[in-house]
Amino acid sequence: MGKIIGIDLGTTNSCVAIMEGNQVKVIENSEGARTTPSIIAYMDDNEVLVGAPAKRQSVTNPKNTLFAVKRLIGRRFEEKEVQKDIGLMPYAIIKADNGDAWVEAHGEKLAPPQISAEVLRKMKKTAEDYLGEPVTEAVITVPAYFNDSQRQATKDAGRIAGLEVKRIINEPTAAALAFGLDKAEKGDRKIAVYDLGGGTFDVSIIEIADVDGEMQFEVLSTNGDTFLGGEDFDQRIIDYIIGEFKKEQGVDLSKDVLALQRLKEAAEKAKIELSSSQQTEINLPYITADASGPKHLNLKITRAKLEALVEDLVERTIEPCRIAIKDAGVKVSDIDDVILVGGQTRMPKVQEKVKEFFGKEPRRDVNPDEAVAVGAAIQGQVLSGDRKDVLLLDVTPLSLGIETLGGVMTKMITKNTTIPTKHSQVYSTADDNQSAVTIKVFQGEREMAAGNKLLGEFNLEGIPPAPRGVPQIEVTFDIDANGILHVGAKDKATGKENKITIKANSGLSDAEIDQMIKDAEANAAEDHKLRELADSRNQGDALVHSTKKALTEYGDKLDAGEKEKIEAALKSLEDVLKDTSADKAAIDAKVEELGKASQKLGEKMYADMQAQQAGAAGAAGAAEGAAHAGGAQQAADDVVDAEFKEVKKD
């Protein structure tokens, strides 16, 4: 059985890890980095770039470079968070036929799971290159506060990438696993994981207990905001720069997508620099131009200014901490360790706020970028049966229920219930002789169903005529270990049953996922062809260079006819390399043609080199002979006449 890899599919960066024995290995990607930007670029020639190469070209291709797609995964187009992003993103966010938020690149509609699958495929390939064997199974992390649709969409992304998702695990829980197994402290401890990533915020209160030599990780509560993260901090800096530039130059950069992409890069860089220095300078020459000529942007930002810009964002993370502590039934003073996860927690202001709330210094011995992937890899090892000393008890982050008479949300499973879990309840009809009931499933904490997230709905038909309140309909909610909900309804009188996995009114159908898998496979074949074409071009370029060099050195030793033949073959190879529409076969044919034409040139070079070597060997032999003679002479010269006297024996 192959290894189960752990993948942290992040909003800004992603990371992959595996377990080797009891040691964890965070794997470097093909660029040599341990984290990969979650950025995907769709190029004009159908090539798909993922990670650092996609990020590098984002300034020149803003409309087709997709980033922070995790913020859209499993979301409806109408949601206010999505509507907010539409005005900020350089790429187009569109409404899919099923009402979900999708994006558009090169006129093609793409589902967020399909785009995230490109990042997962890169992570899969990174692991395969390191292990030297195929990888088919993974544990993928999601924010703890992700709802059912978002978890299902993440699982779909894994499927499209060719991975069997063995488990969806919450990011703070994964970080706690990484932290707990790395520390030697014994005894029960309560820890708070404060996870502020690129696009999402989570806080979990977790109890780590030692039960008969087994490490038990029990999540007591979780809370968060799935639309708050480093991207929002970047946006505050971007808005500030746009405002200052408009005041100074009278030009509004928010309408210029190329300028926006440069601003985004500069804002991220400035934010990172201000974590270690008090002031930074943003310098972007030729940011735009008007009738008076080009405009340059030069702006100093201090740490104090940045903190003022994002103060309310940092403050927004504290209320979920308060709720999580209350829901866990503990006091702030009961928390033994505070762990910071996510790149945004490197900001001194964030660390200061966390220290102020929890009353203690956060731990600094956890890598905020890698802890989540490490935890996912540990869970992968547990699921594969290679590790028996770890037990993980996670919770469902939001209450689940159904809409009952008057539009009320009747909760079936309350938030922070340990999963997997199952709950059944009997309901009845609202009208006399009602032959069918529609069951609408919601997720959220509001009293009225309309204020919560509608996950799906289904009908139970064929109920025998009876007065209202008489039929008995048993509704069962079953949450699996991934936090994904399965619902069933049964008429107790007739035994009629209807079951669904909640993904009815949104998300991708199996047919759509299968089509995306096929497209991905076709893309892989296309990518392979592009790679082969690039290899042929490189081979052709190298041959042109070496042939020209050889002609310069040895061309005068060839017959005029032979030289002309080589020059003609060289010219036709150069022409085919200049032709961007030329395929691999055309290039290979010209390479072979030049190779054959250059045979005589090769023979001349070889003969010349042999002659040089023979000459060098002869010279060396002569020198060696001279050295021998000189040595003999020296040996003779080194003879010393010794004085001796004869000793007579008695």
UniProtKB/Swiss-Prot annotation:
Acts as a chaperone. Induction: By stress conditions e.g. heat shock. The keyword Phosphoprotein applies. This is Chaperone protein DnaK. InterPro entries: ATPase_NBD, Chaperone_DnaK, Heat_shock_70_CS, HSP70_C_sf, HSP70_peptide-bd_sf, Hsp_70_fam. Pfam families: HSP70. The modification Phosphothreonine is found at T200. SUPFAM superfamilies: Actin-like ATPase domain, Heat shock protein 70kD (HSP70), C-terminal subdomain, Heat shock protein 70kD (HSP70), peptide-binding domain.
